Amino acid sequence: MSNGVSVRVLAVQQALETEFSLVEASGNPSSVGSCVARVWLPPKNEATWLLKRYAEDVTYLHHILHLPSVRQQMEDLYKQLSLGLRIEPCHVALILSIFASTAYTLTPLTGGDAVFTNEQTAVKCAFLWSKMALDVLEHSSRSTPGSIEDIQATIILSFVIFNFEGFTMRFRALSASALTMARDLSLHRLDARPDRLPGPHAPLDSDIGREIKRRVWWHMVSTDWILALSGGPQEGTYLMHPAHMRVNYPRNLDDRDLDRYNPQYSRPLSQPTAMTYTLLRIQLADICRSAIDALPPPFSDWGEVNYDRFISLDQRFEAFIRSLPVFFRLDEASRHQSRDVEHQYPQIIVQRYILWSTLQGRRSKLNQPFLTRVSMNPRYQYSRKVCLQSARCVIELKALMDHDMASLASAHVRLATFLHNYFLATAVLVMDLCLNKEGGSSEDRRQEIVDACRVLQEAEATSPMASRFLKSLMDILQKYQIQVLPATTVPDVRPLSANTGASGVPDPNLSDRDLVNPSQILPSTYDPLENANIDDLWQNFINLDQNCSPGSWDHLFSALDSRIV
C-alpha cells in the first residue's frame, strides 16, 4: 500500500480470473482490508500497449493530454511501484481512466486481441478500471489539494461513463466535479494578469503546462455549452459564463510543436493539426451558448416568440458550415481532396463525422419546437425543412462512415455522442411522419425510419446505450400509441447507479449491485424486426390522432429527452 492506494500488477487475464471475481464477491473493491483504494494495473508491456492504443484511437476525441508527459508519468509510476516508493493517487487515477477508455473503444480489428481475448473481456476491463478510477479519485479528493491530473482523469472517466450510461446523473456529476476542481485550481483565470492572481499560480507554469490547462478548460466549457442545447434536464442551462473566465483558446498545434514556437503562435484552422477539431468544437459550442442566451425558456409559449430570431440563430449554424476547412466538409469533392490530410491525420475522418453529427443534432434541436407547429404558421416550414435535413444528415453519416472507414465504422457508431444524435434524428423523422402526412411518399418515409431503427438494433451487440435508446424510443412511442417494433422484444437495461457523494463526485462506496455488470449490458442476440408485420405495425402511425396539440408533441419530445438521461 502506498499513500492509501493499494496497487497490484497483474496481467489482464490473470486479473479477470482473480481480482475481478473478488470484486464481484465483495461488492466493493475498497472494502477489502484496510486500504482506501484497492486497484490492479496491467504489467508494463500491456500498459505501454494500452497507452499506445489510446494515443492512436481515443485521445483525438478529447485532446486534453500532453502525451509525452503522460508516457513519462507512466514510466515513473511503474518504477515507483517496482521500488515500493510512494505513488500519487492522481497519477494512478489518470492511468486507470486511460486504460478504461482504451478498453471500451477497442475491437479485434483495432488490435484488441493483443491483450483481451474478446470484445466482451475488453468491456469488462473498462467497467472494472472505471470503478477503480472512481475509488482513487474519491481518495485523491480527500487526501490531496487536487491536480490537473485529477481533472484529466475525471474528464476521461466521464467519457467512459457517458458511453456506458448516457446523460445520467453520474455523468453530469463527474462533469460538474471536473469544473469545480478546475476553478479550485484557478484554471478559469489562467490568462488573467499574473499580478492579479492570488498566490504563485500561472507564473510558475511552463508554456506546455499552461497550454494543456487551456485544452482541459475549453474541453469542459465546450461540453457544458453543447449539452445546454441537447435536451434532458440540463437543457437551456449551462454552468460557465464567458464573462466569468479569462482563458485563451488553445493553440492549433500538435504536441511536438508546443515547444518549437513562441507561446503566442498558432496555425490557422485551414492547416490541419491534432487540435483543429477541438477548436472547431469550441466554435460550435459558442453558437450553442449564444442560442441558449437568445431563446426563451423551454416552458415559454412558443407561439408568441420572435421567429426571425430563430432564423438568424439557425443561419449562424449555416455560416459555421460554410467556414469549415475543406478537410472537415462532408461533400464528396472535399473528402476526395482531403485524402492526403487523412493519411497524415487519420483521426480526422472520425472527428469529421462526430462534428457533423453534433452540429446537425444541435441545429435540429433548435428548430424542433416548430416542427410540430407548421400548421400554425406557414413560415415554420423553414424550420421543418431544416429539422428534417439535419436529421437525415445525421442518419446518412452512418453510410458515409461505412464507406470511408469500412470495418472500423462499427466501433465508432457505438460512441454515445453519435448514438445520441442518431436516436434523436430518428425521433424527428417519426414525429414528422405522424404530423405531416403530405410531406412525401409515406412508404419511403416509413422505410427510412425502419432502417434507422435497424442501425440502433445492430449497435446493441456492443453498446448498452444503443439498447437503451431503442427501448426508450419504443416505450415512448407505445405510450403515445405509435408502434414501429414490438417493444417487448427489447431487453431491459439498467443504467449505472446515479448515487453521488456530498462532494458531487460519484460515491465509490457503492455495491456492484448498483453498477452495470458488463455481462448484463451486452444483450443476447435477437431481432425485433424478424417476426414483425411491417404493414400492421405502421397502421398505428396512420391512425394516430391528428388533432393532438403542439403542446402534446412537446411533451412527447420532452419524454424522449428525459428517457435518455
Swiss-Prot record:
Major subcellular location class: nucleus
One of the GO BP terms on file: DNA-templated transcription
Keywords: Nucleus, Transcription, Transcription regulation
InterPro entries tied to this protein: Sec_Metabolite_Reg, Transcription_factor_dom_fun
General function of this protein: Probable transcription factor; part of the gene cluster 23 that mediates the biosynthesis of a family of 2-pyridones known as leporins.
A Pfam short name: Fungal_trans
Annotated protein name in UniProt: Probable transcription factor lepB
Disruption of the gene: reported phenotype: Does not affect the expression of the leporins cluster.
One annotated GO molecular function: zinc ion binding
Record region (Fungal specific transcription factor domain): 52-259
Subcellular location: Nucleus
GO cellular component, one term: nucleus
